[in-house]
């Protein structure tokens, strides 16, 4: 036991938000030290067999839609869980080495990984095994809504009911939390990726042009809006795509109203999930939520007026957390402190 405590003094514990779109790492005592796209570029043999890692993170994301046949840019996470085990493990190895160099005085780190509330036991086991394969000494799992709530400074340890809506790249997690536990949770596989896909589909159907994921993401970030109020400025963006009829590059303009029309279906899915949560939570918790409001975290919280949309559709106040992109990773870091105080059995590390 004493040796274990001494090892802990020389080891930087890590909280990893292993997201579909981005991976964030929080180091105890330092804060967020890594924020990189969850993308890996791999070189392939002519037979299609994996050869080597060409790039990871930002460098790999720049290759999306631009690679020669010998290189494939892969996003190994889909809907918040592992889609490609080998590539995920290599990506984690790379990211952990960026923030933690192991030696005798600094052994392999303890790692806490945030997982979707709706992840199956098989999916959770895959995440845990991937982290161990990437060099973790011990691995704990925490559900993303709990980590998000802790990172957003919600009173998770009290009897008061708190609702958190975490909109990530692959999933939206809706949860009610009370007394250090999740009393209601739902996970819908709708997130930033679905918004991007909807924009790509809309552009193809309406303008007869093809655009890639990076362009769709830029459109979403620059002029995307979940709700347009009377008097709001209608924003425009010039887009360059490949015209299907002419077979040549062409430019056209998109407005914020176009984008709202494009992303209406995924927005409706998120609204439906939130409404269901409000209907199914306990009456006392519902009263707490109506009084204190719902808290938005994750990258999706940055979509313009998404708080306005959810408030108008539910009649409940909506608050966007401070720095919503990092809430899950920061909350996981605080959870590591709780592990030191109470032991690892407070989290789902039993798989």
Curated annotation (Swiss-Prot):
This is Cell shape-determining protein MreB. CDD domains: ASKHA_NBD_MreB-like. Pfam families: MreB_Mbl. GO terms for molecular function: ATP binding. The keyword Magnesium does not apply. It is found in: Cytoplasm. The lineage of its organism: Bacteria, Pseudomonadati, Pseudomonadota, Gammaproteobacteria, Pasteurellales. Coiled coil: none annotated. It comes from Pasteurella multocida (strain Pm70).
